[in-house]
Amino acid sequence: MLRKINAIWEGDGADGTGFLTAQSGAFNKMPYSFKTRFKNDDGKLGTNPEELIAAALAGCFNMKLSFVLNESNFNPTKLNTDAELIFENGKIFSVNLNLRGEVANISSEKFIELANEAKDNCPISGVL
């Protein structure tokens, strides 16, 4: 599988703006900038690379966990994961996941075991 994103940046670091376009069409010319990286007080839609990394990890983790649960004969009704990315001194320090799930007939211990398996085998986890 090959996935492509096009990123365009115009201008200098502080005042420039950019646009992200996904091959899939999920977003087209989504704006990003230094201002949306750290604050977005103007109410304009925008994102930043760190937010996209957190979203990719949470989404990939949920999908992987769903498959891991299915392989163990559990059917999730809902998996809800928050990803909190810590960005300090110009570097990503960590990404923490907070998971809540609705899965019938599973013990807390088994759910945690399978969630850890999914975390360890999620393709996005492997690059972070």
Q: Residue spans of the language-model regions?
A:
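Extended beta-strand/beta-hairpin segments
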Residues: 1-55, 62-128
